[in-house]
């Protein structure tokens, strides 16, 4: 039934009952009249004085017909639109039929059907003007939808131009591009202030290299602001749908792939130079995966296997040291500059400036660590430093890996030492660490690879704990846990000690796991959370000295300080060091100690004692036998005593060799007991 008549909109409102529910609808009068011709009022055409001229000639008619045909496609689209409206419940799907019939008559060429006022066109205008509000809203939504689809199509075409659609990771590449487009970039610039840190941890990202570009690897690292690093880790759901897991880390500084060595040095190592002039100890580490840019950062640019040492942090630090020596307040101190360069490989120390001579690391009665036999070269200028760096780099232990054709396999330590009248005034240690992914090679079938990986793993764990102890002023620093931290003991002990770590990362998706491990390691050193409210782990609240004394009193490890520190180190890193891995580290440490003792006794017995034996026979016993009336009883007694002494020495050496062989077998057995699901590499 009709409930109301709306004169303004020329429509009526009707209601009816359907299945017990009252329903309503608004219908315009034109639709009603088009369906019920008997109800339509008679239209009178008033021929006024403004009547248009008579019909034009045939050529004119043809032109009008042509113009009408160009509008036809628009009319053909109208029913489709009205059908969609009818599906929603509108009753405006049919008023177009009279117009279409009128248009068809005009297309047939009947001139008499074309009235002066063109009523068909007038009806079409009224129909479009009298659409209901519901239809208008639907048409607006349709226009927005079509406009949005057009924009999406243009965006897809633009992306197709920017990216290579043949890349197998094209989908991930588009996700990363979309995510980066939503970020606000504020990268680090040279105008930013330099903050003072006792412990500075920063990250440097290198660009994609030629190998990664050739295999179409993706850049999954983003550095939006000066202290934040984001990793876009590709993952896959159970239904094989790929997605990104974006992980955020915060450090003191973050350098993108465009930052040169000079910029990195300005914010990291340069603030430490003044420390050594103030009787302090400064340390700068380069840490990361093989091929991530550690040696490039510390030593300089590479051109194949040739390195430009003048652009590395080694040379830049030496340049500033000599510049500060010219300042009046330091010039009067009459300081002398010395340099040393050595490497630590598989727990052994080698002098890179003295034909890789093997050195011994000892601790004197004052608990001062001494590297016996290490050469210190006096340097007068930066050119002298560059020559020493070239000599050391040329003989550093390296090898070919899947990541790098010239990969460093040892920790290289370059030290700039200031001395005043022979006494140490300050020391700056610059360390290029070995690749952290080698720490996972602790279960290799090759013993040398196992020892190499075990030493790297242990030294990196010890380094992390020593830096944490320095930053938190802990009463005990486990520097004896590894040879690296033992040599650098002075850098972790004392109030005037400062440390900087440069974590270098590879941007490629293939290196994503190692990159995350590097960032997690660097994050644990200082623990700067993006939310700036992270609390220290629970185990840090306990006093390490108490635990160390407890183990010592229990007698589990005897009195060896290095074993106590190793135990402490593994206890503080339970999530990274399994019990089997700890047993393996213990076996390796014992084996290395036995090896040093055997080699030392071997050198003492055969070259030295044999010469004394021959000299003693020549001067004493053999000369005695040349006499006519020599005392044969005395000769036999002395010879027997010398032989017994010699036998005792050789027996002791033989026992040590047996113990060394047992240690080798124990290391072999321990390496096989490591859980295959071992902790990730540092």
UniProtKB/Swiss-Prot annotation:
Protein name per UniProt: Kinesin-like protein KIF2A
How the protein assembles, per its UniProt entry?
Interacts with aurka and plk1.
From the UniProt record, report the name of the gene that encodes this protein: kif2a
Matching entries from SUPFAM superfamilies are given as: P-loop containing nucleoside triphosphate hydrolases
> What ranges does the record give for the region Globular, renumbered to this chain?
1-192
Q: Which Pfam families match?
A: KIF2A-like_1st, Kinesin
Kindly list the organism's lineage: Eukaryota, Metazoa, Chordata, Craniata, Vertebrata
**Residue span, Kinesin motor domain:** 198-528
Q: Which organism is it from?
A: Xenopus laevis (African clawed frog)
Membrane-crossing ranges are none
GO BP terms = cell division; microtubule depolymerization; microtubule-based movement; mitotic spindle organization
**According to the lineage, what is the superkingdom?**
Eukaryota
């Amino acid at each position: 039934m009709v409930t109301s008549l709306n004169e303004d909109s020329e429509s009526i409102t009707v209601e009816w009952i359907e299945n017990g529910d009252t329903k309503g609808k608004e219908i315009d009068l034109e639709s009603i009249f088009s369906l019920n011709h008997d109800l339509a009022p008679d239209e009178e055409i008033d021929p006024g004085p403004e009547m248009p001229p008579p019909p034009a000639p045939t050529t004119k008619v043809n032109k009008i017909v042509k113009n009408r045909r160009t509008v036809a496609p628009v009319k053909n689209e109208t029913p489709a639109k009205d059908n969609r409206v009818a599906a929603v419940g509108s009753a405006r799907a049919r008023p177009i039929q009279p117009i279409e019939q009128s248009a068809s008559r005009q297309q047939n060429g009947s001139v008499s059907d074309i009235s002066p006022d063109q009523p068909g066109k007038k009806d079409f205008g009224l129909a479009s003007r009298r659409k209901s509000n519901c239809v208008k809203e639907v048409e607006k939504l349709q226009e927005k939808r079509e406009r949005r689809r057009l924009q999406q199509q243009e965006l897809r075409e633009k992306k197709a131009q920017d990216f290579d659609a043949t890349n197998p990771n094209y989908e991930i590449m588009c996700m990363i591009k979309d995510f980066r487009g939503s970020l606000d970039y504020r990268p680090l610039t040279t105008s930013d202030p330099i903050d003072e840190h006792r412990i500075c941890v920063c990250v440097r990202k290198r660009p994609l290299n030629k190998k990664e570009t050739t295999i179409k690897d993706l850049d999954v690292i983003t550095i939006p602001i000066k202290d934040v690093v984001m990793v876009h880790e590709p993952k896959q759901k159970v239904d094989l749908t790929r997605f990104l897991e974006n992980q955020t880390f915060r450090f003191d500084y973050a350098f993108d792939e465009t930052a040169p060595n000079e910029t990195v040095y300005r914010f990291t190592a340069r603030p430490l130079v003044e420390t050594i002039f103030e009787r302090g100890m400064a340390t700068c580490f380069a840490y990361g995966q093989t091929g991530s840019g550690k040696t490039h950062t510390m030593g300089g640019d590479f051109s194949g296997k040739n390195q430009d040492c003048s652009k590395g942090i080694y040379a830049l630090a030496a340049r500033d040291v000599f510049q500060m020596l010219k300042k009046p307040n330091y010039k009067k101190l009459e300081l002398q500059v010395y340099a040393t360069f050595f490497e630590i490989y598989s727990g052994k120390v080698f002098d890179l400036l003295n034909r890789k001579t093997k050195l011994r690391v000892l601790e004197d009665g004052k608990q001062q660590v001494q590297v016996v036999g290490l050469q210190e070269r006096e340097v007068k200028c930066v050119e002298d430093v560059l020559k020493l760096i070239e000599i050391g780099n040329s003989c550093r232990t390296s090898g070919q890996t899947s990541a790098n054709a010239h990969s460093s396999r040892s920790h290289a330590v370059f030290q700039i030492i200031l001395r005043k009248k022979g006494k140490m005034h300050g020391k700056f240690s610059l360390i290029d660490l070995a690749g952290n992914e080698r720490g996972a090679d602790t279960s290799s079938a090759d013993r040398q690879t196992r020892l190499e990986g075990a030493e790297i793993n242990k030294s990196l764990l010890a380094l992390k704990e020593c830096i944490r102890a320095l930053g938190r002023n802990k009463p005990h620093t486990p520097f004896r846990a590894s040879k690296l931290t033992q040599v650098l003991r002075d850098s972790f002990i004392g109030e005037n000690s400062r440390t900087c770590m440069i974590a270098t990362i590879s941007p490629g998706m293939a290196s994503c796991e190692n990159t995350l491990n590097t960032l997690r390691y660097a994050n644990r050193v200082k623990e700067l959370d993006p939310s700036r409210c992270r609390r220290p782990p629970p185990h840090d609240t306990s006093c390490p000295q108490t635990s160390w004394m407890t183990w010592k009193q229990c007698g589990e490890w005897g009195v060896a300080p290095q074993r106590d520190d190793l135990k402490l180190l593994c206890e503080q890193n339970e999530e990274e060091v399994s019990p089997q891995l700890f047993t393996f580290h213990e076996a390796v440490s014992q084996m290395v100690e036995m090896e040093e003792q055997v080699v030392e006794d071997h050198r003492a017995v055969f070259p030295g004692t044999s010469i004394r034996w021959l000299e003693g026979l020549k001067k004493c016993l053999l000369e005695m036998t040349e006499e006519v009336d020599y005392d044969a009883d005395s000769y036999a007694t002395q010879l027997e005593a010398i032989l017994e002494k010699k036998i005792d020495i050789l027996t002791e050496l033989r026992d040590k060799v047996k113990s060394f062989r047992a240690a080798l077998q124990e290391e072999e057995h321990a390496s096989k007991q490591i859980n295959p699901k071992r902790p990730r590499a540092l």
